[in-house]
């Protein structure tokens, strides 16, 4: 009898130990699952946070992109004179187009007035006259006349004077400065280069002119005063 009771007591002890083991195992599994859930919540929160930061960064870059533009340009160097010129693109604004048109007419005017080639003399004289006011036409005609010793007809005769524009600057809305150099090629092919600065007072007028003249000066560009002086190169 005592032996049976002892055996039963030992069996009960083992069952209790087994139950404690099961309880501890379940508690461990529950704690582990709870920890995994916490880590998953933290990982999901970090994922959402990084996602929001990425979206915010992309929006910031997209907002700043229009403010930062790359404008390519070309630098051109004249091999004979060493003059450096920047070739830029034309921007799509009305003021830039207006200035570009004025620069075109100013350079055309200076080339025709200061350059000389006997075969083009008549054409250039007419062009300068069409782009000048009546008062400036009169001054130009007197200066260009054959009885004036300073006339390009008497100075250059059979030589060729070529004008190369270096820069064009707006001093005011109706005053423009043209820097250029003049290359005079003599009959023996010797070349002389001199540097000059021209100042032009200009405006655009709506004058009644012929269809042929309108082809030369379609917008009514007109120079009212003109002067050209040697430029001192240091």
UniProtKB/Swiss-Prot annotation:
It is found in: Cell inner membrane. It is a single-pass membrane protein. GO terms for biological process: protein secretion by the type IV secretion system. Keywords: Cell inner membrane, Cell membrane, Membrane, Transmembrane, Transmembrane helix, Transport, Virulence. The chain crosses the membrane at residues 42-62. Its main location: membrane. The keyword Cell membrane applies. Interacts with virB9 and virB10. This is Type IV secretion system protein virB8. It comes from Bartonella henselae (strain ATCC 49882 / DSM 28221 / CCUG 30454 / Houston 1).
């Amino acid at each position: 009898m005592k032996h049976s009771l002892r055996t039963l007591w030992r069996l009960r002890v083992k069952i209790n130990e087994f139950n404690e083991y099961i309880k501890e195992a379940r508690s461990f599994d529950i704690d582990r699952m709870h920890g995994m859930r916490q880590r998953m919540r933290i990982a999901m929160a970090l994922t959402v946070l990084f996602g929001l930061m990425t979206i915010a960064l992309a929006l910031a870059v997209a907002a700043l992109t229009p403010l930062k533009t790359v404008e390519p340009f070309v630098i051109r160097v004249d091999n004979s004179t060493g003059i450096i010129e920047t070739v830029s693109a034309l921007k799509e604004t009305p003021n830039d187009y207006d200035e570009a048109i004025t620069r075109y007419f100013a350079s055309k005017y200076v080339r025709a007035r200061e350059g000389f080639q006997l075969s083009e003399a008549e054409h250039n004289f007419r062009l300068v006259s069409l782009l000048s006011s009546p008062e400036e036409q009169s001054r130009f005609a007197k200066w260009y006349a054959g009885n004036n010793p300073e006339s390009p007809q008497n100075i250059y005769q059979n030589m060729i004077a070529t004008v190369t524009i270096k820069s064009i600057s707006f001093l005011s809305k109706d005053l423009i400065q043209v820097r250029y150099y003049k290359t005079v090629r003599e009959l023996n092919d010797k070349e002389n280069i001199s540097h000059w600065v021209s100042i032009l007072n200009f405006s655009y007028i709506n004058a009644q002119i012929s269809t042929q003249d309108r082809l030369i000066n379609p917008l009514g560009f007109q120079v009212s005063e003109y002067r050209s002086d040697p430029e001192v190169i240091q």
